[in-house]
UniProtKB/Swiss-Prot annotation:
Subunit structure: Heterodimer of LeuC and LeuD.
Pathways involved: Amino-acid biosynthesis; L-leucine biosynthesis; L-leucine from 3-methyl-2-oxobutanoate: step 2/4
Organism: Vibrio vulnificus (strain CMCP6)
Name used for this protein in its record: 3-isopropylmalate dehydratase large subunit
One Pfam family linked to the record: Aconitase
Lineage: Bacteria, Pseudomonadati, Pseudomonadota, Gammaproteobacteria, Vibrionales
Cofactor(s) annotated in UniProt: [4Fe-4S] cluster
Length: 466
């Protein structure tokens, strides 16, 4: 019987497979940031160990950094300590660090792919749940805990049981104006936020292969939001074209050999998945979350659902709680509620294509007077490219704030956050209670939908935008 893409990558990395024991995988890339690494480096220090493979370990600062200044003190005492500790640890252990003053600094899941650190067929880990982003390249990428960060630093390996496999196929082509963010939110709306628990998901179908690498990263980024361990997309010419010429990409004969291997990284026709989910791309409309998990999502032209519409008692209770927290009334349209803040950024939607999509909407218009709107590029490289294209001028003339790279308002770990009961149109990946600030209300949308909400002052259907 044939093998899935996941099975091929997993089996190629099994270093030790003792009978009755969880297999040990070799890890090709270890990405590190300031929040989940301090205790891991402390563990190495206490045990007298070194980093096993410094050439395969890359660190950056992203979660805590200020997006208004390069001052390491700007986000508070804990943030300063974490960033200073990362500097010290990387210097002591010889790990490459792209700190806040480096031209390659950025959100870890933006920085890795744009430098060619992320390559097809690799195993990639990071102490961050959205490591699944890198699966867009056909790599097996997943988040790990701090104790596992220490283990990978020390051994370049990790115990990892084989997961179940799920195929999510998005058949056909999407309509005009429908983005990768809409696709993945529609997927999660169908599977629910727990539908992928215990699985590694492979996304496929015409609507997926039509996506750019930026779009594919958006989809895989949110695999974790349907409960999956990881999400993968088979590499193809789009992948190879994106990687070629990047800083850490192979060159010359090594490039040719790599591409030949990468072409084998696809699911065999006779491979069997443990579960299969299909969607019709033509049915997908612009998506907006209404609740407090990404699975609580509707098309922008649909009414807010009533708890009574859910047959499952757990879902019904969850809907009741979510509506109360979000300050929404069932049956109404989301367009009836004003937004207070807009955030375009995060490891989901802060790449150059996301900046361009928001700029198309913003050009020649003005942000509504009651809205604060932030545009936060995902890395210094994205920022530089956007500025070279004049996108920053478009945003600033429209009344958006053009910020420095960082995780920003995705999570309340820096100065960018929501106040109590503030409503935000956000391009990030999580709308949990308090995720963007205590009692803040988060609605997940695409960059174009977010920019349009900033200008209109409320949610609008981007398909009607003139």
């Amino acid at each position: 019987m044939g093998k899935t893409l996941y099975e091929k990558v997993y089996e190629a990395h099994v270093a030790v497979a003792a009978e009755g024991e969880t297999p040990i995988l070799y890890i090709d890339r270890h990405l590190v940031h300031e929040v989940t690494s301090p205790q891991a480096f402390d563990g190495l220090r206490e045990k007298g160990r070194q980093v096993r493979q410094v050439s395969k370990t890359f660190a950056t600062m992203d979660h805590n950094v200020s997006t208004t200044t390069k001052d390491i003190n700007a986000s508070g005492e804990m943030a300063r300590i974490q960033m200073e500790t990362l500097i010290k640890n990387c210097q002591e252990f010889g790990v490459t660090l792209y700190d806040i003053n480096h031209k390659y600094q950025g959100i870890v899941h933006v920085m890795g792919p744009e430098l060619g650190i992320t390559l097809p067929g690799m195993t990639i880990v990071c102490g961050d749940s959205h490591t699944a982003t890198h699966g867009a390249f056909g790599s097996l990428a997943f988040g790990i805990g701090t104790s596992e960060v220490e283990h990978v630093l020390a051994t370049q390996t990790l115990k990892q049981a084989r997961a179940k496999t799920m195929k999510i196929e998005v058949q056909g082509k999407v309509a005009d104006g429908i983005t990768a963010k809409d696709i993945v939110l529609a997927i999660i709306g169908k599977t629910t936020a727990a539908g992928g628990t215990g699985y590694v998901v492979e996304f496929c179908g015409e609507a997926i292969t039509d996506l750019s690498m930026e779009g594919r990263m958006t989809v895989c980024n949110m695999a974790i939001e349907l409960g999956a361990k990881a999400g993968l997309i088979a590499p193809d010419q789009t992948t190879f074209d994106y990687i070629k010429g990047r800083k850490f990409a192979p060159t010359g004969a090594d490039w040719d050999a790599a591409v030949e291997y990468w072409k084998t990284l696809k699911t065999d026709e006779d491979a069997k998945f443990d579960a299969v989910v299909t969607l019709n791309a033509a049915d997908i409309k612009p998506q907006v979350t209404w609740g407090t998990n990404p699975g609580q999502v509707i098309a922008v032209d649909e009414p807010i659902p009533a708890p009574e519409s859910f047959s499952d008692p757990v879902e019904k209770a969850s809907a009741e709680k979510a509506l109360a927290y979000m300050g929404l009334e069932a049956g109404k349209s989301l367009s009836e509620y004003k937004v207070d803040k807009v955030f375009v950024g995060s490891c989901t939607n802060s790449r150059i294509e996301d900046m361009r999509a928001a700029a198309v909407v913003a050009k020649g218009r003005k942000v509504a007077s009651h809205v604060q709107a932030l545009i936060v590029p995902g890395s210094e490289q994205v920022k530089a490219q956007a500025e070279a294209e004049g996108l920053d001028v478009i945003f600033k003339e429209a009344g958006f704030e053009w910020r420095l790279p960082g995780c920003s308002m995705c999570l309340a770990m820096n100065n960018d956050r929501l106040g109590p009961h503030e409503r935000c149109a956000s391009t990030s990946n999580r709308n949990f209670e308090g995720r963007q600030g205590r009692d803040g209300r988060t609605h997940l949308v695409s960059p174009a939908m977010a920019a349009a909400a900033a200008i209109a002052g409320h949610f609008v259907d981007i398909r009607d935008w003139k």
